[in-house]
Amino acid sequence: MEKDMTKGRPLPVILKFMLPLIIGNIFQQLYNMADTIIVGRYVGADALAAVGSTGTIMFLTVGFSQGITAGFSVLTAQRFGAKDTEGVKISVANGILLSLIFTVIISSLSLLGMRPLLKLMNTPDNIFQDAYTYIMIISAGIIATIFYNLFSSYLRAVGNSKIPLVFLVFSAALNVILDLVLIINFKMGVAGAAWATIISQGVSAILCLVYIYIRMPSLAPNRRHWRLHGQESRNQLAMGIPMALQFAITASGTMVMQSAINLFGSDAVASFTAASKVQNLVTQGMMAMGQTMATYSGQNFGKGDIKRIRQGVKASLEASVVYALAAAVLVCILLKPALGLFFTGNVDMNSMLPWAKTYIYMSVIFYIPLSSIFVFRNTLQGCGYGFLPMMGGVSELVARLVVAMISMAVGSYALACFCDPAAWVTAAVFTGVSYLFVMKDIRRKYERPETATSEK
């Protein structure tokens, strides 16, 4: 089922498209949490810390792949909005072929550089081997993640956010089952958690591809489309690489933050990991709003309706503020009971809770600027402006780097936790100003005369 987001009142259209994305994102976080909870309870706190210590590296590799595939699908959304059926099929086939190339590159670099990277990040010795085992399996199976993200992005590009949700729910259930079987029954430890993630995402990717060919003929390429088109590749890379680099740059900043956290020992790492999982869960609405705005702005940019893009941004910002306030209250309420899910009874929660509270209580104050980043960044990307969001990632990196270096110099865990808020405020200001600049640039260069006339 396709969804034309160039018609109807912006807010209801956005919220209707966004709802399945929120549910899907929450399920994705739940099965990520399932890995962590099952590892923490059935393998131990050190194993939990090991998995958690690789989170920022996963953000780097998985985030890069998400960025590149999302960039490839921007052209699909724009052509769908412009009713260019042939262009849609060409963009899909070309994106798949380019993704195969990037799969080989990302896997090779990850496998070759993982051990030095873990050492560079101050990974504690008592969790190093488990961390290395977990992230190596994830890196080897990155093809499953890349192609699930790619096919889901294509479905969302034409307005279908429900089917990716269905497959994600199935994947989440499969992941939990595999976690229990591989970790508890087969005693595979962190390796079992990694394999459960890869297998479940691979199944979802296959289901998405089958659905596209059976139920979405407008997306399914024919034999003549299966080749690398030079201009198409340049266009997709011009959009995908900046988006991928934006993820990679942001991830580099979180890796610096993780390095600072690692200096405080495995208890701090385990507590921070659990707290960040809870925070990631309640902030998924912000991410879903961003994903929605990428499709919304892409389709409307393809149609040439710039006024409608601005209306959508205004509505989404207002909704995001309400969500950010609700999320801040919710995470504070859930933190203590949720933290207990990650650890067995022989772990002293009184020693774990202060680490988690410090991070969460400092972060919730800045949820509003965090929510605005997703709106501005994804709107810019949907309109084909990839460079400025990438530079927004650079601003996050600089902010995290400065705060992390100071925290390591003075030995302050609280200051290390401030890395995220500092990055959010910096990026919110940068992307907000960039959005205003781009809207003026678009109106001057691209807005259709009839649209401009109707606004006078």
Question: How would you name each of these model-derived features?
Answer:
Residues 26, 30-48, 118-125, 181-188, ...:
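Helix-terminus/linker motif at the lipid-water interface of multi-pass membrane proteins
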Residues 7, 11-30, 34, 57-64, ...:
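Residue-level signal for short hydrophobic patches within transmembrane helices
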Residues 21, 25, 37, 74, ...:
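Transmembrane alpha-helix boundary and packing residues in multipass membrane permease domains
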Residues 1-18, 76-143, 185-241, 297-365, ...:
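Short alpha-helical transmembrane segments in multi-pass integral membrane proteins
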Residues 48-108, 145-164, 271-335, 370-392:
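Small-residue-rich hydrophobic transmembrane alpha-helices
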Residues 69, 138-156, 164-172, 193-206, ...:
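Short runs within selected transmembrane alpha-helices of multi-pass transporters and secretion channels
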Residues 39-59, 125-130, 190-191, 232-239, ...:
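Interfacial/gating helices of multi-pass transporter permease domains
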Residues 16-35, 137, 171, 200-204, ...:
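Transmembrane helical elements of multi-pass membrane transporters/channels
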